[in-house]
A protein has these predicted regions:
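Membrane-embedded transmembrane-helix bundle of lipid-linked glycan/lipid transferases
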Residues: 1-55, 442-443, 454-485
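Beta-sheet entry/capping signal
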Residues: 26-37, 81-84, 148-149, 176-179, ...
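Extracytoplasmic/lumenal acceptor-recognition loop(s) of multi-pass membrane glycoenzymes
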Residues: 34-60, 72-145, 186, 192-194, ...
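Conserved residues at the C-terminal ends of beta-strands
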Residues: 87, 153, 363
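Primarily extracytoplasmic ectodomains and periplasmic/lumenal surface modules that are beta-strand-rich
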Residues: 91-92, 158, 184-189, 401-402, ...
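A cross-kingdom signal targeting lumenal/periplasmic-facing segments of multi-pass membrane
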Residues: 105-198, 202-245, 323-334, 338-344
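Active-site-proximal, structured, solvent-exposed surfaces of multi-pass membrane proteins
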Residues: 239-485
Length: 485
């Protein structure tokens, strides 16, 4: 608005030719002073945004950026490849680069397409178009993503996902942190003898896809992986689905919420809506929202509570006009793992809002099958892994012809070699990489080279040659001109 008014003022002053120059100068000066005053209000006044309060204080940048529970991972002795996770604040999502640990949270203005596809297909809510924040603490996805450790501050144990066991307590900066180890983590490379196409995976309900992916590798063209059984659907018994859709037995809205089956309208802040159901024991429970959208408003927060009254999860709903709207159709809110079955979920709306949705449901994913799936994938795992700059080397003893998936995001620039022979890399499990391996002992090597690096070096060299030739010709031309004169 200020920019528009300034532009109109300049146009007006230019068109009014008879206006004295001193008045024009005074108008421009006055406009400049007003702009400074407005900027000051926006930066410092609490009623106009107080933008300065969001800035990091001088001298505290590193401390703020690394103020994550994962800062204690330097005291964990483990030479294997793994990733670590902790619930993070926005300011610490780049901490892994500073503290040099492998995490599952990062900020990047350009996320890779396969990664975006994975988060959408899995109904994940822990991401935006510019950042990833883990896998919603879903045990099946953590296993595939090599998430081996989770760190929590003391008193947050109720958020612990399935399969994590305490291995160490660490005192740092007068705060106790507990390190938990995932008992169901997969190694960097693991194998399958079954594959399924992405098209067929999409025919399976979103909450069940993660379980399928631990039994059959997802590839774009299964016919290119003939050594593995092509699982067309789950009806032939080769794929098991233990997850269940749970009937919602009741919905209770307080006086500030209405729900007609397609629209939820909250007319006041902290309005609540409670879903009642009879869940499953020893399960992760998910709230499934299909077609969730908010036509008006930029963003609004919804939080979710379960039996103990503690918030287990929250989600920021972004309006359709919001630049960072993920444009996904299905959302799975992880209400957490519990040994006892969950029986209700309270949804709290932090402000007035109206949201539309096509379906609202509860799903439960039993966790007992997870260990057997992981053990099957680990039977012929990548071993003796060596991580070097832009290079990964490991060995495998394959009992038969198989398909190996790596917990490395798929992107151009990677090349794979089996016993020194280059082999094709497939996009596997939507966002990861996979290759063929034959029966027997093999050495696997992965190399990374930034796409376009070689051609850019060639262009640079050619440009320097052209530039040098131009300088020489110009110098000779100058000499010839001097002689002629």
């Amino acid at each position: 608005i200020c920019l528009l008014l300034t532009y109109l003022l300049v146009v007006f002053l230019n068109l009014w030719k008879k206006l004295p120059q001193r008045l024009k100068t005074a108008a421009i000066t006055g406009n400049f002073i007003v702009l400074l005053w407005v900027s000051g209000l926006m930066f410092f006044h609490s009623g106009f945004g107080n933008m300065i309060s969001e800035f990091t204080k001088s001298g505290t940048v590193i401390d703020t950026a690394t103020d994550t529970p994962l800062k204690v991972m330097d005291e964990v002795e483990d030479d294997s490849f793994y990733r670590s996770y902790a619930r993070q604040k926005s300011a610490t999502q780049g901490a892994s680069m500073i503290l040099e640990y492998n995490g599952v949270e990062y900020f990047n203005s350009t996320l890779a397409g396969p990664t975006v596809d994975f988060y959408r297909e899995m109904g994940l809510t822990s991401w935006t178009l510019v950042k990833l924040m883990g896998f919603d603490e879903r045990g099946y996805l953590d296993a595939m993503g090599n998430v081996k450790y989770m760190v929590m501050k003391e008193g947050k144990e109720f958020l612990l996902p399935y399969g994590f066991e305490e291995v160490k307590k660490i005192l740092r900066d007068d705060v106790y942190y507990t390190v938990y180890e995932n008992q169901n983590v997969l190694p960097l490379g693991y194998t399958y003898d079954q594959v399924i196409s992405l098209e067929n995976l999409e025919n399976i309900e979103t909450p069940f896809r993660q379980e399928v992916m631990l039994q059959a590798a997802v590839v774009d063209q299964p016919e290119k992986v003939p050594e593995c059984q092509n699982v067309s659907d789950t009806g032939d018994g080769s794929i098991q689905i233990s997850g269940q859709k749970i009937e919602i037995t009741g919905i209770q809205c307080d006086e500030n919420v209405t729900y007609d089956g397609s629209t939820i309208k909250a007319t006041a802040a902290d309005a609540t809506m409670t879903l009642y159901f009879d869940g499953l024991e020893d399960s992760e429970t998910y709230l499934y929202l299909k077609g969730l959208s908010m036509k008006k408003g930029k963003k609004a927060t919804i939080s979710f509570q379960v039996e103990d009254g503690k918030e287990t999860q929250s989600y920021v709903v972004k309006g359709e006009a919001n630049t960072y709207n993920t444009r996904q159709d299905e959302f799975l809110i992880n209400l957490g793992y519990a040994q006892a079955k969950r029986v209700y979920c309270k949804i709290r709306f932090n402000q007035k809002m109206t949201i539309q949705l096509e379906d609202l449901a509860i799903y439960c994913q039993p966790m007992s099958p997870l260990t057997s799936y992981v053990d099957a994938r680990k039977s012929d795992a990548l071993e003796n892994v060596s991580l070097e700059t832009n290079r990964i080397i490991g060995t495998v003893q394959a009992q038969k012809n198989e398909f190996m998936v790596f917990g490395i995001p798929y992107q151009s620039g990677w090349s794979a070699y089996v016993d020194g022979v280059k082999t094709e890399i497939f996009r596997a499990n939507i966002m990861y990489m996979g290759i063929h391996i034959g029966e027997g002992a093999h050495t696997i090597e992965l190399r990374y080279e930034m796409p376009g690096l070689r051609i850019s070096l060639v262009i640079t060299a050619v440009s320097l040659v052209i530039f040098g030739c131009a300088l020489i010709l110009r110098k000779r031309g100058g000499r010839m001109q001097c002689k002629s004169e």
